[in-house]
Amino acid sequence: MKVLLCIAASCLMLLALNVSAENTQQEEQDYDYGTDTCPFPVLANKTNKAKFVGCHQKCNGGDQKLTDGTACYVVERKVWDRMTPMLWYECPLGECKNGVCEDLRKKEDCRKGNGEEK
């Protein structure tokens, strides 16, 4: 009886994880940035909490800034463009203030993912 209960619980857990993963994928694919916003480039880290590259970018003829206090990497977009995907780099940590990623004088390992758009 305990074995059947464990199997049933495992099946429910797998089903829940599968549904959750499907919802996440659909949300990412269906997200509409609108006509006046563009996605910021990001870098992954070993804690699986991606951070933005810089705090400001040109988008559809205008400027786009991240909110003050947002975590970021002090890395220029042109450097991000040249980074080798899946290769670890030592990246300076920063915090957005008035559209600038201000250096916190700390570093962490980061990497560009596969399939990142340029």
UniProtKB/Swiss-Prot annotation:
One of its GO terms (cellular component) is extracellular region. InterPro entries: EVA_Class_A (IPR045797). Coiled coil: none annotated. One of its GO terms (molecular function) is C-C chemokine binding. It is found in: Secreted. It holds the Pfam family EVA_Class_A. Residues 1-21 form the signal peptide. Its main location: secreted. Keywords: Disulfide bond, Glycoprotein, Secreted, Signal. Disulfide bonds join C38-C59, C55-C96, C72-C101, C91-C110. Glycans are attached at N45. The keyword Transmembrane does not apply. The keyword Signal applies. Salivary chemokine-binding protein which binds to host chemokines CCL1, CCL3, CCL4, CCL8, CCL17, CCL18 and CCL22. This is Evasin P974. It comes from Amblyomma cajennense (Cayenne tick).
